[in-house]
């Protein structure tokens, strides 16, 4: 059930960042950087999947996602909520429950044949579908899910995530060129601000993370393993 009043987008971002820090979803390591799927190093890593084990925080963030989508896209804008395999599935189910809408999920690879080969659940031609995922970095991985939804004859012009990196300027253009609007709760900048406010990590670590956030390509090049 969505409350009749809810925080501003700025307060949602601050609270979401605080909750992610509280459950240990945020990881900073400047001495031994993490390796991204691209193979490039990063001093920061976030694991939104941990949220499923924290019901109070999980519930609050899903309320935030539901109201963010309604605020930005409209109260009657969707007919179906689709989760991306695998991380998006539990969050799609929770958002669908709050919006009283059917839920489906999109496979990474087809199972069987036909235009619904990547869809699990009932999705009909003409339905307006919201794609839900845990996070997005550069937006590229969302396009495959969007294409699979559109192949059914449904439409998909919106995707909602808990966390948006907001450090690669091409992200919104990549999605926008594909006709997709991004909705999110918080970014690395929100997490960094809250981490500084809480002194959750050393000043040196946070300063190094900020260097990465301001110019990730340069930081990655300087810290690339040889």
Swiss-Prot record:
<feature type="binding site">
    <location>
        <position position="137"/>
    </location>
    <ligand>
        <name>orotate</name>
    </ligand>
</feature>
<keyword id="KW-0328">Glycosyltransferase</keyword>
<dbReference type="GO" id="GO:0000287">
    <property type="term" value="F:magnesium ion binding"/>
</dbReference>
<feature type="binding site">
    <location>
        <position position="111"/>
    </location>
    <ligand>
        <name>5-phospho-alpha-D-ribose 1-diphosphate</name>
    </ligand>
</feature>
<comment type="similarity">
    <text>Belongs to the purine/pyrimidine phosphoribosyltransferase family. PyrE subfamily.</text>
</comment>
<feature type="binding site" description="in other chain">
    <location>
        <position position="108"/>
    </location>
    <ligand>
        <name>5-phospho-alpha-D-ribose 1-diphosphate</name>
    </ligand>
</feature>
<feature type="binding site">
    <location>
        <position position="107"/>
    </location>
    <ligand>
        <name>5-phospho-alpha-D-ribose 1-diphosphate</name>
    </ligand>
</feature>
<comment type="function">
    <text>Catalyzes the transfer of a ribosyl phosphate group from 5-phosphoribose 1-diphosphate to orotate, leading to the formation of orotidine monophosphate (OMP).</text>
</comment>
<dbReference type="InterPro" id="IPR000836">
    <property type="entry name" value="PRibTrfase_dom"/>
</dbReference>
<keyword id="KW-0460">Magnesium</keyword>
<dbReference type="GO" id="GO:0004588">
    <property type="term" value="F:orotate phosphoribosyltransferase activity"/>
</dbReference>
<dbReference type="InterPro" id="IPR023031">
    <property type="entry name" value="OPRT"/>
</dbReference>
<keyword id="KW-0808">Transferase</keyword>
<dbReference type="Pfam" id="PF00156">
    <property type="entry name" value="Pribosyltran"/>
</dbReference>
<dbReference type="GO" id="GO:0019856">
    <property type="term" value="P:pyrimidine nucleobase biosynthetic process"/>
</dbReference>
<comment type="pathway">
    <text>Pyrimidine metabolism; UMP biosynthesis via de novo pathway; UMP from orotate: step 1/2.</text>
</comment>
<protein>
    <recommendedName>
        <fullName>Orotate phosphoribosyltransferase</fullName>
        <ecNumber>2.4.2.10</ecNumber>
    </recommendedName>
</protein>
<keyword id="KW-0665">Pyrimidine biosynthesis</keyword>
<feature type="binding site" description="in other chain">
    <location>
        <begin position="133"/>
        <end position="141"/>
    </location>
    <ligand>
        <name>5-phospho-alpha-D-ribose 1-diphosphate</name>
    </ligand>
</feature>
<dbReference type="InterPro" id="IPR029057">
    <property type="entry name" value="PRTase-like"/>
</dbReference>
<dbReference type="GO" id="GO:0044205">
    <property type="term" value="P:'de novo' UMP biosynthetic process"/>
</dbReference>
<comment type="subunit">
    <text>Homodimer.</text>
</comment>
């Amino acid at each position: 059930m969505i409350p009749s009043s809810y925080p501003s987008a700025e307060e949602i971002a601050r609270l979401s960042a605080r909750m992610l820090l509280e459950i240990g979803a945020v990881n900073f390591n400047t001495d031994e950087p993490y390796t991204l799927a691209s193979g490039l190093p990063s001093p920061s890593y976030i694991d939104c999947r941990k949220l499923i084990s924290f019901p109070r925080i999980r519930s609050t963030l899903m309320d935030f996602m539901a109201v963010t989508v309604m605020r930005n896209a409209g109260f009657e804008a969707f007919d179906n909520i689709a989760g991306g395999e695998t991380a998006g599935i539990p969050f799609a189910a929770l958002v669908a429950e709050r919006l009283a809408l059917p839920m489906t999920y999109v496979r990474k690879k087809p199972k069987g044949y036909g235009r619904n080969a990547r869809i699990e659940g009932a999705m009909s031609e003409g339905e307006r579908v919201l794609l839900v995922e845990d996070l997005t970095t550069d937006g590229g991985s969302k396009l495959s899910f969007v294409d699979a939804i559109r192949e059914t004859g449904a439409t998909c012009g919106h995707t909602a995530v808990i966390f948006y990196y907001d450090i690669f300027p091409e992200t919104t253009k990549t999605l926008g060129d594909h006709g997709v609007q991004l909705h999110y709760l918080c970014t690395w900048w929100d997490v960094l601000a809250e981490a500084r406010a809480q002194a959750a990590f050393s000043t040196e670590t946070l300063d190094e993370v900020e260097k990465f956030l301001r110019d990730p390509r340069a930081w990655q090049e300087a810290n690339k393993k040889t």
